[in-house]
Structure formats: C-alpha cells, structure tokens
Amino acid sequence: MMILPRTGFGRGADSVVLVLLWVLGSVLAKDTAFVEVVLFESSPNGDYTTYTTGLQGRFSRAGATISAEGEIVQMHPLGLCNNNDEEDLYEYGWVGVVKLEQPELDPSCLTVLGKAKRAVQRGATAVIFDVSENPDAIDQLNQVSEDPLKRPVVYVKGADAVKLMNIVNKQKVARARIQHRPPRVRPTEYFDMGIFLAFFVVVSLVCLILLIKIKLKQRRSQSSMNRMAIQALEKMETCKFKAKFKGQREASCGASDSVSSSSTSDCAICLEKYIDGEELRVIPCAHRFHKKCVDPWLLQHHTCPHCRHNIIDQKKGNPGAVCLDPGNPVHGRQQRVVLPVHYPGRVHRAGQVTAYPTRTSMDPHGNPITVLTVDQHPEQGLYPSQSSFIRGYPALHLDHTLNPHHCGLEHRGPAYPQTHTFKRPKFHGRNFSRAACFSQYETMYQHYYFQGLTFPQPEGQPSNGLHKGHNRPFQPGLLYPTVVHMAPASSSRLGDSGSTSGLSCYHGHRSVCSGYLADCPGSDSSSSSGQCHCSSSDSMLDCTEVSNQGVYGSCSTFRSSLSSDYDPYVYRSKSPCRGSAGEAGAVFSAAPPADDTSAPVSGMIDCLQPPGGACYSSGDQLSNCSLEPNCSNHSSVETRELTSTTSAGPLEGNVAERSHNSVKPCGEQGVACNCCFEVPKLNLERKGKEGEDRGHCRWATEAQAVASSQNFYSVSTEQLPSPDHVSYDGLPCCFYTEMTVHRGGANHYAEDCSVNIQYAQTDSDGCMGQGCCELAQRIPIIPEDTDCELGLGPEPQTSLLSSRLTTEREERTSSEDTCDLFFTSGQCRGQVYQQPQDEEARALFSSKCNAVSETQGSSTSSFDGSGL
C-alpha cells in the first residue's frame, strides 16, 4: 500500500470543514432550547415538595427564540383540529405539550404549523412538540414562513421526549421554564452560605487550639503542683508517737517545741487514737495526723485538712508564716510579740506602729499563742507632725534569754506591707502652754499594753523556788494575767521648752484602765477574791463577754449603765505616781490604811512628793501589779468600791504658788522615794529645811540621770525585794526592767528596749514588805494618768467633778486651804469604807501610818487638792 503525501489542497479542506462545524455548532447552540420542568408534590399534611428536571429541545423557525414559562397543559392533536374558536378556550400563561402521531394515523385536518398557531391563539405562551414518532414534522416547522409566531415553538425527541411525556402523564401539577441559553448559576447565590461555613470553621479551629493550649497548661501546672507537693511532703517533718507514763499522749519528734495538733491523742481524719510507734505527719501549720491518712489528702488538695494551710505556699516562702527576728540588727525595727489565743489582748500604740498577726500555734507547754509583728518605723512622710506629748515611745521586744524562741520558722526580713492604720489627730504643736486635753479615744490610741503574756521561762535555767500562795505552786509556762506598758520618753514631756505641764486632764473624766482575765466568769453582781473566781447570782459567763473595755483594754471615762457597772479586773497599783516636769511638778499617790481607825474624809487624796528638783521621765511604775475586779452592781449615783479609780487633772498654777504651798504629811514615816520605794524615817530635826532632798537616795540619783539621758524610765528589780524572801498575797504579780539602748533619732523610736519580766505569786499571809502585791494597788497604765486613790465619801460620784472645780477656786483664793486637804492614806480611807479590807489594806511601804507627822519644809511642788 502506498501512502501519498498530502498536498496543500487537502489542508485547506480540513480548515473549511472545521469552520463549518464551528458555525453549525454555534447555530445549533443558538437554536437549543433548555426546558426546565418543576414538579410540585404535595404531602398529606399539606406541604409541597419541588423537583426540577432539565430537558433539551430545539427552537423551530416557526416561532421566536425567547424565554417562556407557564403551567404544562397536555393537548391532543385532534383537539387542535376544531375550528370553533368558542370551544376549548384556555387562560393565558400556559405551555402546551403536543405528542404527534405517526403520519398514517395523524389526521390531516391541520398541519403541524397550523396546530402551533391554534395553540398560541388559545393563550399558550409556548408550544412543545414530541416528534419522536413523526420526524417529518421537524422539516415542516423549520420552513421559512412569511409570518412567524411571536411565541417560541420547541420540539423534543428521544430520551428527553420520554421524560417529558412521563411527567405530563403522571403529574397533575408541573411547571415548565424555557430558556434559550443554559441557566447560569449566580455567583452570589451560595456566597453567604460559604462565608458562614468559612467563619464557623475558623472559629472552631481557634477554639480547639485554645482548648488544647489550656489543657496542656493545666496539665503542666498540675504536674508541677504535684511535684512541688511531693517535694514539700518529703521535706515535711514526721515523728513517732510516744505515750507518756500517765496516759497523756504527746508526739516525740525532733522539733516538738514548734509542733502542735488539733487533738493531743487522736487523729482528726480517721478519729482513731494514736498508738505508740505510729508515724505522724507534722504539717508546717503545727497540726499532726496519721501519715497514711494525711499524705493522700496533701498530695491531692495541698492544704491542711484542719486549717486549710497551703503547703505549697509554705514551700514557696509565704510571708504570712515567717517570724521576724528582732535580734537581727538589720531588722531591729520589727518586734515579735507572743500573745495567747485565749487571751486576745489588743495592741494600742501611739504614733506610727502597726501590728501584724503572723501565725498561731502552740508553745511547748500546750498553750495556744499568737505571734504578732509590730512595725515601728513606717514612712514618716505619710503622717503629720506629732505632738511632743505622744512622741518618743520606746521600742519593746521580749528578751530571748527569758523568752526562748520556739517558732521553728524561717527567719528573714520583714515581708509585710507597711500599712498605716492610724493617722494622728489635729495635734501638731511642739509646746503646750497648758496641759493638753485628750478624749478617752485618744487615750486608747496613744497607749498600748500587752495582756496575757506567757511566762517567759529562761532557757537552760531551772525554775527557782516555787512561790506558794494558797497552797498552790507557781508553775512556769502557765498563763498569768500581766501587763507590759511602754511609757513615752521624758523628752516628749520635759524636753520641750514652754511646756508647763505634760499631764492631760482627759476632760476631767474619771479614768478606768481596764484589763481582763479571760478564764474567769463574772457578771453584774459578781465579786472577786485572790483566786480570781467570780461568783454571780445571775449567770456564769466569761468575763470577756461582759465588757468590751475589759477585752480590749482601754482608758474609759466614768461609766454608768442601766443595769451594770461591771468592769472586770481593773489593773491597780499603789506605787508612787510621777511628776509632770522638772519644775517640781506635783504628783499624787494612793496607799491603803493600816487600820480602820482614821476619820472619814470626803474628797481628800494622799500626796507623795517626788524628789525636789529631780527631772525624771514619765514611765510605768510597775513595781507591783495585780488584778482586782470592779464588780459594783450599783447605779452611777452610788458610792463606788475601791476598784474605782479617778484621774487627776492637769495641775495648774504658777511656780510661785507651788513654791509657797506646803503639804501636811501624815504618819511617822517620811515621804517615800520614787525610785527605790524606800520610806526614810522622818527626821524631826530637819523640820525647817527645804524639802528638795527629801526621799532621795544614791540609786535614785543615778537611775534618774541615766533615764533622763536615755529618755526612758527605768525600774530595776535589784532594789525591789526578792521574791524568794518576801511573801505575797493575792494574784500573781510581775516585775520588769527596761534596758535602754541608743535611740536612732529625735523623731524615731528606740531600736530595742529589752523588758525582763519576773513573776511572783503572793501568799495569803502578811503582805507588809516592800514591793508587796495587793489587790487595791493601781498601776498607772497611762503615763499621763497621774491620779491617785481618792478617799471617797458617801456622796455620789457625780459630784466629784464639781467638788474639784470648787476646790480649784478655793486654791486660787487661798493657798493655805490647799494644805488642809492633803492627808496620808490612813486618814483618807480609814472610815470611808466600813467593811473589812484585810487584803486591800496593806500599803506598798512596810511601815504603818499611825500618826500625823510634823509639817515638812517648803515643798517643791503644790497640789490641786480637789482631785476629781
């Protein structure tokens, strides 16, 4: 077979064929009719469902190539042969479908074109012919006519014709839409749905990613917390339980001093008693449980089951559980004060001091204690300038030699925010032309004291002889009601020029410095004894629930209530009072009588003069202290018992009046020394001499010189009678010594002032020695409160203030009348109270006042003989 090469003519023929095919295709594409049939199917409940079927046909030249739409109506070919126009009329808007029969069977009444015209005349928008059985009809429709129809004429065949006829025969409702081009899908038809889907997908992915990250972070944190809990648990203390010989059980571990638990003998989780040899877990909060009981809880919850203490925070170094060591010179401005929980004493501090509760645990003797941290040096710029009356309070911290450190915590610097709870009131002047007047609330704010301190047992020192009182030993470690009060420095009262008096009148109110003994019941009609038992005819309740002043410790005014005037356990002392300034300020002192033979005197007070010319600072004379319940159940117009005290107002008057006024001393003894509390025998030969050397001693001169230089008032226990050689009566007493140190500055507190507290229990037998602790003795808790015991007559207490004012007027008119108002304690109280006062009648001084001594020389100070 031979293949001839193609010539150029053949290539041209192929191109022509392709062009013809393209033109034919374009023509055919232009004549193609796209028929869209929409079916409506109804459901039994009335809903319609639509189905769309697409068919293809051809536009014939007999009609127009336009779009049309309408309801499908089937027409029979014989029906179109009727020439009657009045019959078979249809409304406009329908699409006629005609199935052509075979030519042999088709009636020749009308041609195919004539039938199309007849349908359009009857209202058809379009005519569709099925030419499957009569293909010759296509040629008839494509013949060019002079008058074509204005409506489309479409013919279909094949599969599309079968689908169309099935729809027409089976469906009652169908609608046809004829288009001359394929229906184009609008690009915005599904655009909104696409945007929604894209947004939903993006948000879902973001949320999923965040959830995964959070889950991973929680897992890492949980694993880290678990690791920290495991580490804390490994570092936590464990101990073996060991039963004591008397049945009392206590854990025996390496640091038992800082270990406590919610129960002494049983586990708070399983409620089973500890058995010898069982391993106990000691949590840093000092609670202990069975190791097998508490370890799973600690690993899961990381907190103590009893107090919710977080062991993780403890491991991280939570500042709330540290103990600031005042012995560190860097942090010497912090104090550590230990208070029992059951003795909720409050801290009232003048100036810029804030107390922070650090932690609560138990001491080695099982007593609950609270560790407070007192900040003494906040920022000075946040406070206004302070008056000289309240400036210069010394610092306080318990000496570690007497107060062993058993907290067992990490010692580091202060980690507390320097919060400023108080702001000073409107007292800005440095000099007072006269005594400043402060209200009782200022009094509470200016002073503070600590109640219920635990007995400071020295480390490594055996307890000295047990001081027995009422056949009861004084055991170390027990809680005894004591008061430790820090007085302002002397520079705050004596160092400023122009200050005639540093004393305050407190509005002339009768001051009652209150404390309490927490475990002693009492009520309105209660009474007290040396054993601190309060009996009541009404009820038995805690003394702390009776008076808020007893709970918080305050300086209150003369109180009168509707039902009760009970003030539990007023701290009192008969120690000599203080002078006000170096210019021979007058002071008062109270002493009980030795017997009941003195005449009653109303409104008279005792006098005890300080050494003439001695300039010593104001401080607390805590030589003796005791508790005495103020259990008067009478109204305010009745005469108070010895538990009531009065506050002397500020002493006014010029120096000339003071220098010329004299005092009538009583008794055989001379005026007591304010420093060593010794009463020198009265020298009758020195009757006409000056009184400036009266009551002085070598120790007093030295102590006062040191105290003045250091701005402290110092009381030494060396001059006090030893507890081993003196019998005591009443409740436990305390003695303390303030050890002064160098002050940081004029406006700052001292870095440290070590207070050594000594306790002694009195004996029921005689109490006539020096330093004797008595129930009727008054401790001047407030430095400015220099009042002394008044000999109250049977007149009401409400008349005391008026009596004072009257006496002041009498003093201004005549200085000699003032001297007649002053008596010794024997004359002041002898017959005012007729009831026996064996325990309350013992004075601080050993000798008794039996007779009135001779008049001393010209005194260095004068008195405002009215008192209150």
Swiss-Prot record:
- GO CC annotation, single: plasma membrane
Zinc finger map (RING-type): 267-308
> Which InterPro entries does this chain map to?
Znf_RING, Znf_RING/FYVE/PHD, ZNRF-3_ecto, ZNRF3_Arkadia_E3_ligases, ZNRF3_Znf_RING
Subcellular localization is given as:
Cell membrane
Entry keywords, A to Z: Cell membrane, Membrane, Metal-binding, Signal, Transferase, Transmembrane, Transmembrane helix, Ubl conjugation pathway, Wnt signaling pathway, Zinc, Zinc-finger
Q: Which residues cross the membrane?
A: 194-214
Q: What is its EC number?
A: 2.3.2.27
Q: State the similarity comment.
A: Belongs to the ZNRF3 family.
Q: What is this protein called?
A: E3 ubiquitin-protein ligase znrf3
Source organism: Danio rerio
Q: Which gene encodes it?
A: znrf3
